[in-house]
Amino acid sequence: LSKQMNAKILDTIRRIEANKDFTNPTYMRLLTPHFYEQHICRFPADEWPDPVKRTFKHLNSVIYTQMQGPSEFGIAGNLANWDVSDLLKNITTPTLTIGAKYDSMDPEFMKWMSTQFPNGSYLYCANGSHMCMYDDQQTYFKGLIKFIRAVDKGEKKVVLD
């Protein structure tokens, strides 16, 4: 994702990260429009839905940083080496993974993950980000409702396109 950023802005962000100055107000001032508004929820932050605003307002940064690490451009926290992909085959409940074009998570990885569940299905939101339930609602809810209805009818895998 960093490759998509303006080089000057990315350079400033990298410099702040190299100095471990994550509380620098410039850091969040740059991350908000150039990362969060592009890859988390694709609206200006002041127009984010109320649940998103509340989430960010009440985010426990100590726990988030412990798990993710201080940077949004790589995992350096407790999750850095956490991998349970070999256990996904044991989850037999119909499972839907969702990927989106602008997501901070790789949609191809989400698609791959759906193939690891015995009853996995995948939904791609072509106009969405990490919170595609807000910024690609048509695709997200059409796919989610189709998945729920199919599972309710007893289907294990659902083709969503």
Residue ranges and their predicted role:
Residues 44, 105-106, 132:
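Short catalytic/ligand-binding loop motif for oxyanion handling, primarily in non-cytosolic enzymes
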Residues 4, 8-89, 93:
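Alpha/beta-hydrolase
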Residues 32-36, 114, 141, 145-148:
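Non-transmembrane alpha-helical segments in soluble domains
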Residues 119-161:
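Catalytic active-site module of serine/aspartate enzymes centered on a nucleophile-bearing elbow/loop
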Residues 1-8, 152-154:
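The C-terminal output helix
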Residues 1-2, 110-114, 137-140:
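Short, glycine/charged-enriched secondary-structure capping and boundary segments
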Residues 18-22, 104, 130:
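Short histidine/acidic/glycine/proline-rich micro-motifs that form metal-
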Residues 85-128:
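Conserved loop-alpha-helix segment in the C-terminal half of the alpha/beta-hydrolase fold
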